[in-house]
Structures are given as structure tokens and as C-alpha cells.
Amino acid sequence: MHNASYWGPERANTSCPAPAPTLGCPNASGPAPPLPPPLAVAVPVVYAVICAVGLAGNSAVLFVLLRAPRRKTVTNLFILNLAVADELFTLVPPVNIADFLLRRWPFGELLCKLVVAVDQYNTFSSLYFLTVMSADRYLVVLATAESRRVAGRTYGAARAVSLAVWGVATLVVLPFAVFARLDEEQGRRQCVLVFPQPEALWWRASRLYTLVLGFAIPVSTICVLYTSLLCRLRAIRLDSHAKALDRAKKRVTVLVVAILAVCLLVWTPYHLSTVVALTTDLPQTPLVIAVSYFITSLSYANSCLNPFLYAFLDDSFRRSLRQLLACRTTS
């Protein structure tokens, strides 16, 4: 039920039911074209896999970070919050599957608003926490290269920053929950966003709202941080701390490649679909709908990739997980 699923202002309601595609709504105007059988099977299967993998991966992250006292660090606190956001999102795909198979919203309006809010939390909070983690890495790696400590970088400060991120995300997501409601479309009850008049203006504003606040600003910030860091590291003169500098360069290179590659891979097609939806009027062909569901599924997969990217690539995390599992087995 991504907000990027909205098709256009020509519809009575300016939103689509979940799980909605990104380039068009199957019920935007007139009867929805029949989905090809492979797509009708693939969509719920893919959503189920995303839910299962995301639930398992993020549960493992939470299990280790909450049960291992030595892992209570600033970085791990941000990873913990990221895992919480992704874990919450795993509640969305099962609801989307039910809506997809039944072709109508089978639940009440309260759950409609809740699912919309959780879905939007995934869109915004993940990149917001990645931005905070990037800023933290910027300070830490640069301080390491210069053989100094980051002033004020404490666990308590990280808690305050995390609460601030959740607060900002809540304010950003709140309008979607307000506009979410049940509505009859073509004789079917749907969970949609019903915008006031003029619908065309509100629809375009909602797309630009997500594009700017949910992608352009955080990704630009991440790029500026790592570009600046790489430039500053290259400018630092090698001295007796050359080994620390070399390690810092390696860490920042891995972080730049991992964060930016995954971020762009997952979110760029999703947000480019906003530009397409705003500038073109694509016919709702089976191909367009299939591409739309693929883009939506790719953005959903973000909740699966984060645990591997930010936790499972850490050797110490794997050791902690094995130790905790061994303790549970022997107890």
C-alpha cells in the first residue's frame, strides 16, 4: 500500500488498495484488467517470502542486540532501531496478501489506518536511520583517522537521537494515517487514501512529499557525508597513525559501497516511478501492472536486506548469535 502506488487524479479516489503497484492502479478507471496467472501466483508468494525472511532476519538482529550486553554500543543502537522498523513492516505483507487474493479489504478502518502508517514508517524511517548512521560513521571514521574521540558520542545521546528520528518519522507519516479510510470502489470495499478537493493537487503533492522527504533529502545527505569524508581522508597526511587511517579508509569504502548500492538498488526504481506517474499517463496494461508490482516488491525487500547488510556482515554478530543459540540449546 505504498503511497507511490497512486495512479492519477482522474480517479474518484486518489489512491489504491493494497498491495498497490507503483505505476498504476488496477482499479484506477473502469474494470481492472485480468492479471496474468503467473503474476497472480507470484505476487503473494514473493510477499510471503519477504515477510518470512524479514521476520527471521530482524528477529535474529533483535535477539542478539537485546541479549548480548557487550553489544550495547551507539552503532548497534541505531541498528536495533532499524531492525525494529523492519520488524514492524513484516506485519504489512500478510495483510497485502489477503487483500490481493480477496480483491477487497477484509478488515476494519482502524487496521486500514494502522497498516498504512506502518507501511509509510518503512518508507521514511529506514532511510532516516541510515542517514543518522552515516552521520555517525562520518564522525567516527574521521575522528579515528585523526586519532581523537568524538565528543558527546554516548549511548544516552544515541537514544535521544533515535527518539528524535521516530518523532520526525511519526510527524511525516501522520498525514497518510489521517487520509486513510475505507471506501467503496466498483462495489468492493477498499483501504484507500481519500484526499480533499482539489484531488489533482493533493495527489501530486503526496507524491512529491514522499519523493523529497523520503528519498531526495536523506540520500543527498548520505552522498554528501561520504563524499566529504572520502575527500577529507585523502587530504590527511600519513604519519605515525597511518595504520588507523588505512583501516578508516577501508571501513568507509565498504560502508559507501554497501549503503549506497543497496539504497539505490531498492529505492531508486520506487521513487523514479513517482516521476513517471507525475509526468506520463501510462495505459494499465498487464506489463505495466507487472512492472509496478515488481518495483513495489523491490522496495518491500528493503526489510529483508537490512539485517544482512548491517548485522550479518559483522563477524562479531555471527559469533554472538551462535553463542546465544548455544546457550539456549544447552539450557
Curated annotation (Swiss-Prot):
What keywords sit in the KW lines?
Cell membrane, Disulfide bond, G-protein coupled receptor, Glycoprotein, Membrane, Receptor, Transducer, Transmembrane, Transmembrane helix
SUPFAM superfamilies listed in its UniProt record: Family A G protein-coupled receptor-like
- Please give the positions of the paired cysteines in each disulfide bond: C112-C191
Q: Report whether Transmembrane helix shows up as a keyword of the record.
A: yes
- Compartment list: Cell membrane
Residues annotated as transmembrane = 44-66, 76-100, 116-135, 161-180, 206-227, 252-276, 287-301
Pfam families, per database record:
7tm_1
Side Cytoplasmic, residues = 67-75, 136-160, 228-251, 302-331
Main location class: membrane
List the record's Gene Ontology CC terms alphabetically. neuron projection; plasma membrane
Question: CDD domains per the record?
Answer: 7tmA_NPBWR
Which of the residues are on side Extracellular?
1-43, 101-115, 181-205, 277-286
GO molecular function list: G protein-coupled receptor activity; neuropeptide binding; neuropeptide receptor activity
GO biological process entries? neuropeptide signaling pathway
Keyword Glycoprotein applies = yes
Q: Which domain of life is it from?
A: Eukaryota
The protein's recorded glycosylation sites are N3, N13, N27
UniProt membrane topology term: Multi-pass membrane protein
Check the record and name the InterPro entries matching this protein. GPCR_Rhodpsn, GPCR_Rhodpsn_7TM, Neuropept_B/W_rcpt
Q: Which family does it belong to?
A: Belongs to the G-protein coupled receptor 1 family.
- Function statement: Interacts specifically with a number of opioid ligands. Receptor for neuropeptides B and W, which may be involved in neuroendocrine system regulation, food intake and the organization of other signals.
Give the protein name, as stated in the record: Neuropeptides B/W receptor type 1
Gene from which this protein is expressed: NPBWR1
